[in-house]
Amino acid sequence: MACPWKFLFKVKSYQSDLKEEKDINNNVKKTPCAVLSPTIQDDPKSHQNGSPQLLTGTAQNVPESLDKLHVTSTRPQYVRIKNWGSGEILHDTLHHKATSDFTCKSKSCLGSIMNPKSLTRGPRDKPTPLEELLPHAIEFINQYYGSFKEAKIEEHLARLEAVTKEIETTGTYQLTLDELIFATKMAWRNAPRCIGRIQWSNLQVFDARNCSTAQEMFQHICRHILYATNNGNIRSAITVFPQRSDGKHDFRLWNSQLIRYAGYQMPDGTIRGDAATLEFTQLCIDLGWKPRYGRFDVLPLVLQADGQDPEVFEIPPDLVLEVTMEHPKYEWFQELGLKWYALPAVANMLLEVGGLEFPACPFNGWYMGTEIGVRDFCDTQRYNILEEVGRRMGLETHTLASLWKDRAVTEINVAVLHSFQKQNVTIMDHHTASESFMKHMQNEYRARGGCPADWIWLVPPVSGSITPVFHQEMLNYVLSPFYYYQIEPWKTHIWQNEKLRPRRREIRFRVLVKVVFFASMLMRKVMASRVRATVLFATETGKSEALARDLATLFSYAFNTKVVCMDQYKASTLEEEQLLLVVTSTFGNGDCPSNGQTLKKSLFMLRELNHTFRYAVFGLGSSMYPQFCAFAHDIDQKLSHLGASQLAPTGEGDELSGQEDAFRSWAVQTFRAACETFDVRSKHHIQIPKRFTSNATWEPQQYRLIQSPEPLDLNRALSSIHAKNVFTMRLKSQQNLQSEKSSRTTLLVQLTFEGSRGPSYLPGEHLGIFPGNQTALVQGILERVVDCPTPHQTVCLEVLDESGSYWVKDKRLPPCSLSQALTYFLDITTPPTQLQLHKLARFATDETDRQRLEALCQPSEYNDWKFSNNPTFLEVLEEFPSLHVPAAFLLSQLPILKPRYYSISSSQDHTPSEVHLTVAVVTYRTRDGQGPLHHGVCSTWIRNLKPQDPVPCFVRSVSGFQLPEDPSQPCILIGPGTGIAPFRSFWQQRLHDSQHKGLKGGRMSLVFGCRHPEEDHLYQEEMQEMVRKRVLFQVHTGYSRLPGKPKVYVQDILQKQLANEVLSVLHGEQGHLYICGDVRMARDVATTLKKLVATKLNLSEEQVEDYFFQLKSQKRYHEDIFGAVFSYGAKKGSALEEPKATRL
């Protein structure tokens, strides 16, 4: 047999004589040098000045022919590696052990080539020759035994002999499990392009070398994914499949990663999904995979076992952990619909160790944030979202000098890190990763005298020179064991079943488009056999669009569904519809959202349809408004009059009471009705998504409370819950603007920023405030909780996962005490919904209470009870005293306490460090004045504040209610009561511009209304001062409670005193008109204005509607409207009549 001993001390002796070459740093000739004996450790203590001494040793019990072998010791040459940031110098000697040359040429550097030949292994068509395999095997065995702290000479020599004999007998050899584990870890340690190698010794190795079929490969991979994902606490792992034999029986994973998203070339030339996977996605389709044509479809596994043709396996969805992207500051970021998988697992690399090749060895670490935020999301050949994010941020994307790309990519990375951390999924930012690599590099130079590193790959794609790796010189070389790239298997595979062979294609754009077009044609044929369903939406905030897309998802299980915004839909298309589903909000005074106005106009002009269809409508709104869901009902009535058939009753989603529950119930009801009406095949076997069929009961065994050491950061918690940029202001002062004669209270609230200056705002914008519930309500509920934790104990709610096998943290609320949750996060004043009452019924120990609660689940009973009592949650517990509610129920079922919005009553230029608000304090009694006293949540909370108390808040932009860009344009301001609030910011801004900028504004007339000049004429003296300073042109006030005089409202003033002024401003001078107040006033004002304009300009009803439509389109008719609070049985004339809806 071949003798291994000659390789024991001079591992490289089988190679040709080394050529002399000059060291680029030391300019001396390189000469062959002896290597460490495997019996001597590469002890860090033997290194001096960063360069290890070369030691020699004599092995025991070696053949007599080697007794006279003499190995001389020479000091190895080194390469100086400098850190230009710190000035530190390292000496690399490890590169002398490099196993192959790089492909760089004498006159050119190929360091930036993605897959250089030197790092790529191709296929083989015959076994590795013995004379090539044996030296590598001996070298690895020496390396393995040289890693022990204590020499194992006898075991070492025995293993050398066994390996040599096995190679001579079989032509190859098998690694022991310990050798395999050592090899995989060392290959990671030697990977020059990996920045996270400091964890190299913590790699979990799964030995799958006994695998024989693709099905077994799939099972091993599923185990790998499950272990590595670990519910988000990612663990690094590798699974090693059988080694290459003769090159004809390879095991391969055709995927580049275990988990990756598909990419589709659509018929119109656009790309949907990940553009980097276009070729592989098409291959999967050719192999029989059914595409779904979504942006984030997980590709199947394509597995090749024993050289056979590949097989396709769908990864079980429950194995794929995905993170939905959101931003801690920009709530619109969620509208981008981005997500990413948590597990980065490379699947297509080859492990080389000791002359053996393992072409199937998927392995994973965890993500560095920039891999997703920069490369996956922002690369132009990937998802390419950079410009869209820049536009949404309001950046100047038309000029590179604005650095919009840098600002946008930073926020995208912030979103990625925030999303992973919020969902408790392992991720590392690029700064921390860079620091960890520098530590690893220092460790390696102390331990091995070097660290192969590819600077181009290790410097993160953002931040550049502010990361330490940027300033570090690096030496790149290949050591063994090593992970190599491979040629894509579909380019070299020899097909055994020609029927399975995909059509041979080059990745040419034209060919790929044709293939995708053909696949899409097949999909269209399938979809064409289904009934067409169009989902129309109109929205101001994006809520209706989100629900419309959810509805489309549900209907796509049985219908050919598309989603269309109303501003992109033509009324004439109705003639072609089969099923029309409408989801829309109602805006302002019963109007449609802005993107529904054009369709509304054309739809309501139609007189009849030649073709009828089925339809269903769902409206969103707030029951605070008298025209609740008015536009949805208008659509319903118009479609019915045109002859269309209603599929299901019009649904209503109340923002104040279980809106999403109502939508889900309506959606499922409508879907089932549609399946019955259109006789959908297999309609009884369609699996409706779980989010639409959530259980109407609450199971206590599904929830538990655990203690948490995390202290509550209120601002951070509110920011996370509401996706707002929450900051703290302090109360400076508050002053009652009403006189002592008035029974009501309206406050001028002055808030100051913490620090010199807070976030910027414009006149007319809103301040959102996060109030706290009243202490008495909170304490009353706590006293009735059956398992109430100690008052100040921080707890965290956990829920069982769907499989029921483990607990996961509920992400709705942060860890906090129950008292804090009831005070700051949960709504305890809004009446419970019917669904909540149904869930509560199970906790009633008295049968009468239980039956009454069940009866209230009926719409008629519920509505009477709700509108008569308007009960708080505490009042419900008092009405049904046998209720024993657990703390977990409150934390999981009570709705989130929403912020209250107030128009800002100050100009930031005029009072730079302050924000002023005009707040009406609301109190009322239910049951015709005989019920308990109710207090407005936010107004009462503000009234009880003391100077310097904190106020968590945020600024909400109101783009449609700001001063004209041209200050010379005339304005009419109409605002009775607290509707005056934004106009105070207007006149303060005009005063500042006049005094400090010399800008002379156009005439600005104010129309104000209140009850009595000696009771509630808000800002009376300030208005008079603005008139004297000619900031306000004129002020007209209507009083509605002057004894012995008729009531005068703002619309009366417009009609009797300002008709000519209105016409001049709107029609003659192209000016602006602003209305702020409750919806009833705005409706009356609009009616008066239309009559006035119609009379003056001799317009028909249709023409005047079109005239005001044009005013709104030109953004010259502005409304800031809030809903009137209706008296849930309140006594007429009570303080409730102050219209303050969302500002309670």
Swiss-Prot record:
A cellular-component GO term for this protein: peroxisome
Catalytic EC class: oxidoreductase
Annotated spans, Disordered: 37-59
Impact after mutating residue 211 to R: In strain: NOD/LtJ
UniProt-annotated binding residues for FAD: 766, 900, 902-903, 918, 920, 924, 937-939
Pfam families: FAD_binding_1, Flavodoxin_1, NAD_binding_1, NO_synthase
Activity regulation summary: Not stimulated by calcium/calmodulin. Aspirin inhibits expression and function of this enzyme and effects may be exerted at the level of translational/post-translational modification and directly on the catalytic activity.
Location of Phosphotyrosine modifications: 569
Binding site for NADP(+): 744, 923, 978, 1011, 1040-1041, 1047, 1049, 1051, 1084
Binding site for (6R)-L-erythro-5,6,7,8-tetrahydrobiopterin: 112, 375, 456-457, 470
Cofactor, free-text remark: Binds 1 FAD.
Phenotype for residue 27 to A/Q: Loss of interaction with SPSB2
Induction: By treatment with endotoxins or cytokines. Induced by lipopolysaccharides (LPS) in macrophages (in vitro). Expression in the liver oscillates in a circadian manner with peak levels occurring during the late night.
Family stated for the protein in its record: Belongs to the NOS family.
Function as written in the Swiss-Prot or TrEMBL entry: Produces nitric oxide (NO) which is a messenger molecule with diverse functions throughout the body. In macrophages, NO mediates tumoricidal and bactericidal actions. Also has nitrosylase activity and mediates cysteine S-nitrosylation of cytoplasmic target proteins such PTGS2/COX2. As component of the iNOS-S100A8/9 transnitrosylase complex involved in the selective inflammatory stimulus-dependent S-nitrosylation of GAPDH implicated in regulation of the GAIT complex activity and probably multiple targets including ANXA5, EZR, MSN and VIM.
Name of the molecule in the record: Nitric oxide synthase, inducible
Lineage of the species this protein comes from: Eukaryota, Metazoa, Chordata, Craniata, Vertebrata
The encoding gene: Nos2
